Amino acid sequence: MGGLEEIKNEAVDLENIPIEEVFEQLKCTREGLSSEEGNRRIEMFGPNKLEEKKESKILKFLGFMWNPLSWVMEMAAIMAIALANGGGKPPDWEDFVGIIVLLVINSTISFIEENNAGNAAAALMANLAPKTKVLRDGRWGEQEAAILVPGDIISIKLGDIVPADARLLEGDPLKIDQSALTGESLPVTKNPGDEVFSGSTCKQGEIEAVVIATGVHTFFGKAAHLVDSTNQVGHFQTVLTAIGNFCICSIAVGIVIEIIVMFPIQHRAYRSGIENLLVLLIGGIPIAMPTVLSVTMAIGSHKLSQQGAITKRMTAIEEMAGMDVLCSDKTGTLTLNKLSVDKNLVEVFTKGVDKDHVLLLAARASRTENQDAIDAAMVGMLADPKEARAGIREVHFLPFNPVDKRTALTYIDADGNWHRASKGAPEQILTLCNCKEDVKRKVHAVIDKYAERGLRSLAVARQEVPEKSKESAGGPWQFVGLLPLFDPPRHDSAETIRKALHLGVNVKMITGDQLAIGKETGRRLGMGTNMYPSSALLGQNKDASLEALPVDELIEKADGFAGVFPEHKYEIVKRLQEKKHIVGMTGDGVNDAPALKKADIGIAVADATDAARSASDIVLTEPGLSVIISAVLTSRCIFQRMKNYTIYAVSITIRIVLGFLLIALIWKYDFSPFMVLIIAILNDGTIMTISKDRVKPSPLPDSWKLKEIFATGIVLGSYLALMTVIFFWAMHKTDFFTDKFGVRSIRNSEHEMMSALYLQVSIVSQALIFVTRSRSWSFIERPGLLLVTAFMLAQLVATFLAVYANWGFARIKGIGWGWAGVIWLYSIVFYFPLDIFKFFIRFVLSGRAWDNLLENKIAFTTKKDYGREEREAQWATAQRTLHGLQPPEVASNTLFNDKSSYRELSEIAEQAKRRAEIARLRELNTLKGHVESVVKLKGLDIDTIQQNYTV
């Protein structure tokens, strides 16, 4: 192992010595390492990953006490012992200890929850750890990149992120994108023997390589500290700061008013003045806000991961809740990505060749292992997959790349003659074969015929290679035939797209296929056929006829785009964002990375390449669109909880500051800071459960409407403050409660008034959460069991304190059950108007007519599914108008008012569509006369056939 020590200390220049010497120095062969040798070397070189900075748990815990809201509380704690020290009384130790306890409780909850969420996320991310193909014990297998050691043989192909620094072995040159490391925007060509760096992306080609450096010894590992590690302040952070600042400013205004009135005007005692200021500071600060919101997000992201969507960035959840446009890849997301070939429709262009031979050539130009979807479909068409290589010797395989858009195999037949077979995009193959105009016309006619049925075309060509070498150009290429490929839609795609529209998310299909195929898939999925070829709108060769049209508007209104190149995806996202949309983009390939990064929510679909995963915000672990839609719903629930809480926090700040300010200044009554602390601690306990509360997701895309949050908070908070002031006046200055309810008068007992006031503030402060958490009447929308239990427990504690506690230091004395009952009754009566205030604010802010507000399925709606059917009808009419179709003759209102007739109408339409489809099938030449017999022979159901296949 002496030589390996030198390598570990980087004494050997493995980058530049000849490749044979690399094997000597690394003591390995082209057959790779054994597992034992691999384990031995891992102990020596360490795992192939960058060392993560271990965060100190104590510092992390203390970090939760380091934010503007906590600073205000810490200032209050210092005030309690440093300033509250006059008037012949000792420092206020009770309040000091209480504040510290409150801070510790908050930090502990944040710390535990974030830790749990972090562990869950780490476990999930481990499943997504970069994988690599490595040769161990003489066998190729997919392993985690972390196990690589110098001397391993790895395979690198299109879309892979290179897992370690390596030297390339024999094969075709690779195109490598090193922009992540060097900033070069263009891919560089790497020839056999060259070094490739860890972290760069393979853009073209496929080759084997020998690992020369791993982990911290790689070029990437050494430069890792230079890599961009800026933490961009998310939108969420900005909102948090804005709400925190609003609360702090409200308290500051209250304190300034108190100081001006109490000392120069009323000449109050120093100590009681300081205590009044402490009441505002302790009661007004929503100290639990960062905790509640981060816990809600952490629990939410865990829930999302259980549904198959892993969030890499917590704040992507709030963007997901506000997403109103989803650009979805067609292949694999809307469709199954399981291609099949319709053998009857294969077109042959060369004399003396039959359909079976065309299929055989296509299978030869495919991989037999490590296949992509098209390779698998071609080889799968043969009776036995081994036929693809039967009787021939493979010389060289050219893998698919986005530039040539074809694959090719050079092989030697049984007689020793050399041939090449190639399959790929028809345009590329036509150019390759240098076909005459009439052949091109015929090919295009067949492609169009396929496309009308939603079939993609694949062209096959062959050539002789008389020079008998893999580098030679060979003889002229012959265009052999065209194959129709069909990728059936997923069974749930159509239903999911309908769901998305109900949720206010517009799904746009993005496909590299021709326009006709895009439209056919759109028609099958019921998402509309208003599609454009993206090159006509965006590329260099824009369509002159579309020049005059507003491109941005066309992009906004389109149902999808066909013939899309990766750079168009980026452009589409950018244009939609300029139109103020929040855009989600799905992607899987290495070339989708820029668009995924640009989109508000980049979604890497299941089986995406490493490059796409690293650029995305959310990684899906299951295929299909339905995962995305359920993630949208979950995100909206999470967002709803956070929004409910922020409205609550603002209301409570206003209610405490205004209520206690008025009582202190009008009646010169000093409330005990310790009792405000008790209210704050009990409130926090209850509020923590909101992260698991049962909520209805918003029926439309949701966003932080700060105006609504502040307006609602100010109105509800002021109303509650007024209720408290009126209650205090009735108890302190009148005999109202004594006369009406027969309770004894406590107007002269300051300590009993303290208990009564404490209970009144405590009940309504916490009951307010039920108002802010609901979109309609708070007593109709059922809250989560946890929230109700926490509320009941906290109020039991508060009531028992008010009834029995006799604490001299807190200046409270028990008031008995009679008064407790009266206070509960008072609180319940004045609770009901809160909902009406809530609706009123929403009405004023929405700026819409009252009926429209009702229609917007908020507050009073009794409609099933929030009036979904009317929305469907409105949407259908809008779509017809958009596509220039006449609205139905019948007065649509009467149609859609009656639910049963709406259903009936749908059924009639379905049947009509089915009849038309059967008629069309019968008309097709291929089926004249045999439709029924073919169907019966194969034991198929004609209805299912036309939903899934174009026969």
UniProtKB/Swiss-Prot annotation:
Pfam short name (any one): Hydrolase
Active site: 329
EC number(s) given by UniProt: 7.1.2.1
Keyword Lipid metabolism: no
Superkingdom classification of source: Eukaryota
Keyword list, A-Z: ATP-binding, Cell membrane, Hydrogen ion transport, Ion transport, Magnesium, Membrane, Metal-binding, Nucleotide-binding, Phosphoprotein, Translocase, Transmembrane, Transmembrane helix, Transport
Residues engaged in binding Mg(2+): 588, 592
GO cellular component: a single term: plasma membrane
Gene Ontology terms: biological process: proton export across plasma membrane; proton transmembrane transport; regulation of intracellular pH
UniProt topology in membrane: Multi-pass membrane protein
Cell location: Cell membrane
Catalytic activity of the protein: ATP + H2O + H(+)(in) = ADP + phosphate + 2 H(+)(out)
Coiled coil regions, renumbered to chain: none
Cystine crosslinks: none
SMART domains with a match to the protein in the record: Cation_ATPase_N
GO molecular function: ATP binding; ATP hydrolysis activity; metal ion binding; P-type proton-exporting transporter activity
Function: The plasma membrane ATPase of plants and fungi is a hydrogen ion pump. The proton gradient it generates drives the active transport of nutrients by H(+)-symport. The resulting external acidification and/or internal alkinization may mediate growth responses.
Family: Belongs to the cation transport ATPase (P-type) (TC 3.A.3) family. Type IIIA subfamily.
Protein name (record): Plasma membrane ATPase
Source organism (scientific name): Oryza sativa subsp. japonica (Rice)
